[in-house]
Amino acid sequence: MEETLVDKKLDLIAKPIKMKNKQHSQITNMPYVKHILFVFLAMVLSPPASSQGKELTWEELREQYEFPEWYTEARFGIWVHWGAQTQPEQGGGWYARHLYMQDVGKQNWGKNAYSYHNKTYGHPSEKGFKDVIHEWKAENLDTDALLKYFKKLGAKYFVALANHHDHFDNFNSTYHPWNSVNVGPKRDIIGEFSESSKKYDIPFGVSSHDDRFLHWWLPAFGADTSGVMKGISYDGHMTTKDGVGKWWEGLDPADLYGLPPHKRTPEWIEKVKENWMLRHKELATKYDVDMLWFDGYGFPYDSYGKEVCRTFYNHNLRKTGKMSVVVAGKFKDEPLTVKDIERGGANKILLFPWQGTLTMRSWFYKTDEHRGFKHNARTVIEMMTDIISKNGNLLLNVELLPDGTVPPDHKVILDDIGAWVNLNSEAIYASKPWNIYGDNLNSYLKHSMEDMNEADLEALKKNATSEHFNERTLKDPSYGPDEVRFTTKGDLLYVFVLNPTEGVIALPLLGLKSKHKVKKVNSIRLIGSNDNISFEQSAHRLILNVPAKRQNKYTAVFEVKGAL
């Protein structure tokens, strides 16, 4: 059980106080000592300042904060990167931006957006992203069913997208009219997910990607550079007057797209930042979220983002008497935050909690022909294994369909992942890293050298030592059959054989003379089986037999007793 602040203070009181001299010791006989002790107890046992109404500063929060166990022990969470940009079947994850670009340049993931939009919705001078939002109904969204399913898969926390770069809020925002209650689904999506998370006792987080708003929408103020519509302004230039008699009457496109570039004054930009802050303070407090996750390499809008986080922590402290929430993002050595690594993982064991985010295909669900699966159950499980061996959590995106349901072909993969997680749960949840995360590291490179040119090999080596976007996909060579990862729990060591094949593997790090001070192994068991596994331990290696018959075809996990 987690030691509370009160427990620590009581422990402090219970310890004997060493007096410097006899004169000091005589005060214990004085009548007023009871009064002093009473005051002292009142001080140390009083709740944190924020729970009494005083807002703690960032520095004061740093002194008190500890990462909550629900997060550090979770190891596996599920995220739905789902919003209005899912509505178009094609066009990539930046559809709202790319629909206004005849030429997307190097951003080739959005190359179909402009043509698809013209064919499906009309020309962006009349029908822009505002009209895509209007078409999005989320008609089959059942948040209870989704949370029940995600919990069955073994997810220990859940995250929903609150807004994307498109500046559209998936919650009932007091400060932003372009939200899912006013437009599109006419539902408080975050509110529904929040209630279902509580119902199924799963910590709930929200992701925000809106701090790119100021530059992300600039193409909406352009026009075609060629063709019959050349020079006709896109709908970013529309005003409230243009909406009279239309479905969006009363709404101002400028609240969604921003002002045209030539009208953006420093004062207006400050108002945008202040509005962002108000929206996100409301998001964090109204829905009592357990995690705020920002898609950026620092606090959104600097001090504004930091103030949102300060409010978030204080709200949690005031309501529960402790800080049990998490702020995550692509931070670098930022106290009170979890480091997030997009589509990849750390290249070493990190001392503090972190998470790797992954998706099987694209972030938003798309059917573009050039967008096949990057991952299947095998590669996701391998990524999860690598991440938890380095003290991280895997946050896996589930690409919901526009109607709010899980695509059937994705469900097949998710079911396989869930079966593996549930089978090997003892080696996953609440596990800790060992002295080193793995053995026979990058042995696959030895097997790849015969079939790959020098440039490809160098790219693989670089990928193995990077972080963001270092994911190993279906296109990459498989792990060598002897490459393993480690986790621990108590006095047990768990060995994850990433790409198991029948036969023996040698693990040098588990020899009796290993620099990691390995003890004599007593027994080895394949999780999912009651049969002991044959092995041989010498001074320089542990030889482990991987059986052909296993309950699951993916990464094989062995419980090793005695080594630690």
Language model region names:
Residues M1-V6, Y95:
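Short linear, low-complexity motifs centered on an aromatic residue
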Residues Q52-L564:
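Mature catalytic domains of secreted/periplasmic carbohydrate-active enzymes
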Residues K20-L37:
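Bacterial N-terminal signal peptides that target proteins for export
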Residues K15-K18:
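Short, positively charged and aromatic/hydrophobic N-terminal segments
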Residues S46-P48:
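N-terminal signal peptide c-region/cleavage motif recognized by signal peptidases
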Residues I36-V44:
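Sec-dependent N-terminal signal peptides
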